Amino acid sequence: MKKIEYKHTEIAVKKKLGQNFLTDQNICRKIVESAQLQENDHVLEIGPGFGALTTAILEVVPRFTAVEKDRILAEFIRNEYPSVRVIEMDFLKIDLEELASEGRLRIMGNIPYSITTPILFKLLDNRRNIFSETLMMQHEVARRLVASPGSKEYGILAVQLQTFCDVTYLFKVNRTVFKPRPEVDSAVVSIIPKTAIFDADETGFRNFVRTSFGQRRKTLHNNLKKYYDLSMVTSIDLKLRAESLSVEQFLTLFKELRPLPD
């Protein structure tokens, strides 16, 4: 097991937590600049680690909250950055609605590779409590978020996030600026929840998207026929595969379907 030491604090890097610590302060400042933070913003940092991004955020926002699961790192941040409120907890278990009681959150963070998708879906579920997200993640996942119809990266994650948020790929981050060095590069992505009201059954829509991509090589007809009445569909050729449809076409198709009784 690798160990990382910084300012007399040593931790055994937990691979299962996806702990790779950003070391380049110029990259951290670029992330903060991209987020366009203001002094009074309600910032929530996910997994501050040894505080590289924390330092850059504090240059703009003097007081904010950070969530850190690792006990040693949480204590380090408390001691090193007294103005940062540290919640020692698994981010996936935190109540974002409660944290947003004084204003919508600006989410920042270098999120762990191992739980990137669960974090993204938690943020999606809580998007009404969020003003913006500026997140660093595995480059491959970032590409999937902004993928276009017809590409191999286009799938459930792209459709669901692009339906409810404006997603922008900002810039790539080389693996050499992390300790320990990961096997892949990273990228920074901006996610801004849309303010428009979703005029359909959101849970039903998200289940429909998952079902549409159930088996990628199958047509929409074959993926959907067990679960929906397809007789009213007129807008989409159901011989197509899900990866061919735009977000708008998914919405149109969903409104033409009727779930079959259990």
Swiss-Prot record:
Gene3D superfamilies: Ribosomal RNA adenine dimethylase-like, domain 2 (1.10.8.100), Vaccinia Virus protein VP39 (3.40.50.150). CDD domains: AdoMet_MTases. S-adenosyl-L-methionine binds at residues 20, 22, 47, 68, 90, 110. The keyword Phosphoprotein does not apply. Keywords: Cytoplasm, Methyltransferase, RNA-binding, rRNA processing, S-adenosyl-L-methionine, Transferase. It catalyses: adenosine(1518)/adenosine(1519) in 16S rRNA + 4 S-adenosyl-L-methionine = N(6)-dimethyladenosine(1518)/N(6)-dimethyladenosine(1519) in 16S rRNA + 4 S-adenosyl-L-homocysteine + 4 H(+). GO terms for cellular component: cytosol. Its EC number is 2.1.1.182. It comes from the Bacteria. SMART domains: rADc. It is found in: Cytoplasm. Its main location: cytoplasm. InterPro entries: KsgA/Erm (IPR001737), rRNA_Ade_diMease-like_C (IPR023165), rRNA_Ade_Mease_Trfase_CS (IPR020596), rRNA_Ade_methylase_Trfase_N (IPR020598), rRNA_adenine_dimethylase (IPR011530), SAM-dependent_MTases_sf (IPR029063). GO terms for molecular function: 16S rRNA (adenine(1518)-N(6)/adenine(1519)-N(6))-dimethyltransferase activity; RNA binding. The keyword rRNA processing applies. Belongs to the class I-like SAM-binding methyltransferase superfamily. rRNA adenine N(6)-methyltransferase family. RsmA subfamily. Specifically dimethylates two adjacent adenosines (A1518 and A1519) in the loop of a conserved hairpin near the 3'-end of 16S rRNA in the 30S particle. May play a critical role in biogenesis of 30S subunits. This is Ribosomal RNA small subunit methyltransferase A. It comes from Chlorobium phaeobacteroides (strain BS1). The lineage of its organism: Bacteria, Pseudomonadati, Chlorobiota, Chlorobiia, Chlorobiales.
